[in-house]
Amino acid sequence: MSVDQTLYSRTPTAMADPTCAGPAAFTAAGAFSQPDLMAFSLREEEPIWGFDTIAPSMASWQGKMEQQTFCNPNMERGLKNTHVRNGQPTPPPFDDKKLQTPMGEMYPVAQYAFNSSPPEYAPPKHRSSLSEQSQTDGYGVSTRRRKASAIDQCEQQQEREKREKFLERNRLAASKCRQKKKEHTKLLETRFREVSNKKGELESEIEHLRSEVLNLKNEMLRHAQCGDEAIKIHLAQMVRLITSKDTPNRDLVSPMRSPEQMAASTPHGLSFGFDGPMQLPSEMGSPLDQRRDSEQSIMTESSYTFSTDDSFEELINV
């Protein structure tokens, strides 16, 4: 196989691959002609032109393939000045540094833009989308939390205001209750003082009336010997009342008396549900009979004589 066949058989493959489609390939394909290639012969087993393309699976292969494919940018000039010795090409006889053109002028990068983006950049986009989604989720959660916290603060503020109002009402009610209690206490104190004063006045009036009664009784006793019938009757009633009151008092004053004496001191006129009063023996009731005789003698209308005046005055002053 000749070089011409090798070159034209592999050029479409190199052009078909978009990753290896560079300006050097187009320049080399347009610069070679069939008469120039027939000037020298090459072995078929020694491939000099690196037009074989490999579809890269990673982004790092792109730089390596460009270096291997376009290792000599001045391909046309090199092919014209190359001489083959012992089956291998020799370098050109003159310096290439003077004739080399910069890569930026020969191959402008802006004119050759790839249509499809490499698949290696898809995962970072996915990660960025996940991060953006997490950021949006976090922002939503934070906003919800802020709203919830704001609602809680509003509720707490309302509860605090309600409690303050309730406490204020309680304080007002307590102050009113204390004021009413003070007023009621003052009213009771004034009423107590008034009643106490009234009681004192009444007690003093009672004492004054008692003293007047005693004075009147004494004045009446002074006139007992005047012989007035009304005075004598009134004095007899007074003696009877005094004796009726004095008999139970004597029983209470002498606790050392025997039961027989207590039975003897009971009056004859007691009735325990019978038709007539119960009669006591004469032996036990002899002192009482004597006294009753004396009382009857005093109360008789025929005689109003007294034994002694001193005994009567003692009975009055008891």
UniProtKB/Swiss-Prot annotation:
Belongs to the bZIP family. ATF subfamily. Induction: Expression is barely detectable at the basal hyphal growth phase but induced during conidial development. Keywords: DNA-binding, Nucleus, Stress response, Transcription, Transcription regulation. GO terms for cellular component: nucleus. One of its GO terms (molecular function) is DNA-binding transcription factor activity. This is Basic leucine zipper (bZIP) transcription factor atfB. Residues 160-223 form the bZIP domain. It comes from Aspergillus oryzae (strain ATCC 42149 / RIB 40).
